[in-house]
Amino acid sequence: MTETLVIRLRASEDAPASWLIVDANGARSGNVQSGPIADALALSQGRRTVLVLPASDVTLARPDLPPVRGAARIAQAVPFALEEHLASDLENLHFAVGHRDASSSAMPVAIVARATLERWQAMWDAAGIRPDAAYAESSLIPSAPNALVLVLDEGTLHVSRPDQS
């Protein structure tokens, strides 16, 4: 699989998805298309499929965790490390834990409401899409040392802090 189908979901259920194909170097192959997510199904055959999720539905965090070994123990520790910073009950949230940077105790985490995740899963299951990866829009904004990076996209301002990677 040298090409990747990138599908961007919108915050509004009524808004169409948009997608494009990129080659192994990240160069666009063709134009951005939009419509119902099912329309992207034919393009997913033989390609890696990546979803870009609305930043408004995904909270990104980097909690400092004590040295804990094993994915299961880390998954148990993360919600409690973030509990006081979240407005929702922990059982209503899904926590996707990234890889710890060897030079830090911070652990990248993406948090999404379980109901929202289930809605997305139903949408891509109904369309026959099998994603290989999913990223929050805001996690795709590049960072720069000692500077904020701001991206204005269709009325939404995305911000990448200097310490965000």
Question: Over which residues does each language-model region extend?
Answer:
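Hydrophobic/aromatic-enriched cytosolic interaction surfaces used to assemble or bind macromolecules
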Residues: M1-S165
